[in-house]
Design a protein with these regions (language model features):
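A conserved FAD-binding loop/helix module that cradles the flavin
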Residues: 181, 295-335
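Active-site glycine-rich loop that binds ribose-phosphate moieties when present
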Residues: 151-158, 171-181, 203-204
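Beta1-alpha1 glycine-rich phosphate/pyrophosphate-binding loop at the start
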Residues: 23-24, 29-83, 167-168, 177-200, ...
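FAD-binding core/adjacent interface of flavoenzyme oxidoreductases
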Residues: 4, 9-31, 99-167, 247, ...
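FAD-site-proximal beta/loop scaffold in flavoenzymes
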Residues: 147-163, 254-306, 314
């Protein structure tokens, strides 16, 4: 618990330190990025480097806050999540982008006229939106689980697997990917136990796979954890049986943070994997609402930090291309009006030049 408290204190300290006064540009921003994690900051970085006016609004609640380090990210493996984000914010600001601490309450309007309203009633206008708010991991309602999250209660073998290698690992069945999750963790330890929990024990091919890999399947509902000296030491079943374990893997229900988009008709839907809900997007990151893109865990629940950052950059590039197209169409329309209007200032100047010739300056 002390580790979680320390992490929370560090996050709050950053969040309050980042409460800055942002003076909105006269015509609003080209893009408001909602969410200041890896996807949002990398997207903002791309947009700022493309000379777009961009504002990042960050609620300061990153999904990976309980983790001690980010893993699987080249040249940054093991870096504390808060430190990585601090570097990202500095890079965005270095190119003229703005980062603001705040929580979005609602979004209204449409492309070229979105209004993003915060919970403290501040409001910002944007031509386009990039949604990178991530997701919330909803854990099973088992006493003690949330206090161990990100420590000895883990979910991703690629994010946390190395740290629990060769330990006594348990896998709590909570969804359709439970057997697959157990097989992945078997790669990291020869001592893996599969807890069926409220589901029926595996049968058929699934049972055969577990047996072939030496994974013991334990029936019965899990009632709680056994923690000794702030370390997980066992999993307690409802009948009182305790199975010694030092790490427990669980698949949470992953829920996209997207409720604030209801005002523009954009809502999260069930993910095809059955693991939670997400915002669906096309191959470019575009949502079904014109002018709105999304990237990172809000649309791809399984994305790690590197994947999320890459998705943010790619969506930002597509978004910038869309703005370039809009700017060009507006410029062409203005150009056509100018050359087609015989009484425009440009045409009158041209007529004067043709009539007066070289004497026009002396008239």
């Amino acid at each position: 618990m002390a580790t979680n408290v320390a992490v929370s204190v560090r996050l709050l300290a950053w969040w309050w330190a980042e409460v800055v006064t942002v003076t909105e540009q006269q015509d609003g921003y080209d893009v408001v990025v909602i969410g200041g994690g890896a996807a949002g900051l990398n997207g903002a970085l791309m947009l700022a480097r493309a000379r777009r006016s961009v504002l990042v609004i960050d609620a300061g609640t990153p999904r990976n806050a309980p983790a001690e380090g980010v893993h699987g990210l080249l040249a940054r493996d093991g870096m504390p999540p808060g430190e990585l984000l601090e570097l990202g914010r500095a890079e965005v600001r270095g190119y003229g982008g703005e980062v603001l601490a705040g929580e979005v309450e609602a979004v209204t309007g449409a492309a070229d006229g979105f209004v993003v309203t915060l919970t403290d009633d501040r409001a910002y206008r944007a031509r386009r939106l990039l949604v990178t708010t991530g997701l919330v991991d909803e854990l099973p309602e088992i006493p003690g689980l949330s206090a161990r999250w990100g420590r000895d209660l883990v979910h991703c073998p690629y994010c946390h697997g190395w740290e629990v290698r060769d330990q006594a690992i348990g896998v709590l069945a909570t969804g359709p990917m439970a057997v697959h999750q157990a097989l992945l963790f078997r790669q990291l330890s020869s001592d893996v136990v599969f807890f069926a929990h409220t589901a029926a024990p595996p049968v058929g091919e699934a049972a055969e796979q577990l047996a072939a890999r030496g994974i013991r399947a334990v029936p019965g509902e899990v009632a709680g954890l056994v923690v000794t000296d702030d370390r997980l030491t066992g999993v307690r079943l409802s009948d009182g049986t305790v199975v010694a374990r030092t790490a427990l893997a669980v698949q949470p229900t992953m829920v996209a943070r997207a409720g604030f988009l209801d005002g523009i008709g954009l809502r999260a839907v069930a993910h095809p994997s059955g693991l939670g809900v997400h915002l669906p997007v096309d191959a470019t990151g575009r949502t079904e609402v014109a002018g709105v893109w999304a990237a990172g865990n809000v649309t791809d629940p399984a994305a790690q930090v590197g994947n999320a950052a890459a998705a943010g950059a790619f969506a930002a590039a597509q978004l910038n291309a869309d703005l370039v197209g809009a700017d060009t169409r507006a410029a062409v329309a203005a150009y056509r009006r100018a050359i087609e209007d015989p009484f425009s200032a440009r045409m009158e100047a041209r007529v004067a030049e043709l009539v007066a010739g070289e004497h026009r300056h002396g008239l």
